[in-house]
């Protein structure tokens, strides 16, 4: 592979090299690689409607990559569940902001689930609960009706101290219910 020199990578938070990055397997598919490409030439301060585009390339990896979605901030990662439920994380480290969206690859739609400040531990939902799928890969644990995912917050910061919790999150109503604390 031929990669550009990192000497010319723009400095500063949220700036990235102007090339593909964040290569990862799409855990809900048998053999598909996902990666991000900057749409702003790597400069976050560039005024564009979307800063990154995320692509997938299926085995045998010699076809044309398919664009899955675009992000308004810098793409961080995707927690895959199935072809209708995936959590897309994007962030602006310089402003300590994050956003998590619901991506449905079947209908090719993406919608914001929640946003927050990375230093606000009181409102941190925690990490999504996962389970192994038929490929032996970790994917989101989704309820049978496809409406609910689980979050595990091992810190559970609150005004009363750290109280870890397990919560269910309805992806349609965007409501959280703490099951155990």
What is the role of each PLM region?
Residues 1-181:
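Beta-propeller folds
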